[in-house]
Amino acid sequence: SDEIENYSAKQIYDRAEYEMARSKPIDAIAFFSDVERLYPYSEWAKRSVIMQAFANHKAKQYKEARDAAERYIEYYPADEDSAYAQYIIALSYYDQIEDIGRDQEVTAKALQAFKKLIKNYPDSEYVKPAELKFDLAFDHLAGKEMEVGRYYLKRQQFPAAINRFRTVVEDYQTSSYTAEALHRLVEAYLSMGLVDEAQSAGAILGHNYQASAWYKRTFSLLRNEDLSPAVKGTGWLRKIHRQVLKGRWL
């Protein structure tokens, strides 16, 4: 409004902070925007941009939060709050991650944004929480692959199931789903009569997760067929096993 133009940058900024303290982020955003608009090159404007990112995120206005955070990084790339701005960008995606059954594009974007934070701001205080959330988002994507793989397995669409479980083993090997993925591969390969592949998947599972319930199930599954875990053939599982022996896998 015209009236707002009569106030100093600090006065408007203080009003915005007052609204934040009252848990009214939408009202605060309007005042932070006024500071940026009326006093564009001031220190208060700089603070207002990062606070717009924060307030929009509080208000669950994720796109607006990202826009403000990206603007901050563009204007002040060397500033100490740039790491926080990048964290807000990552959080704006992360906080939209839904159940495993939903589309995972937003999860992939969260991973990219966390990766960028860890790479560009390695000494930042936000690296630790970013790494933790990265691992959770990474697990989430692996969970999606597992869900689809189980769906195909249940319907005896074995090649389609194998493709999903293979993706978990190759691309999400540090996730919490890898042991199950290897067991499901044993199930699917045995169902198709691909004995070498089933034994190979069982051997990798035994090498890395010998104490797990999944390995016990695999071992008894193979034993029922008079088989044992052993790397056979020349396929993709042999390559994985070679990496295991060299300590390059898991």
Annotated model-derived regions:
Residues 1-250:
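Acidic, polar-rich low-complexity tracts and alpha-helical solenoid repeat scaffolds
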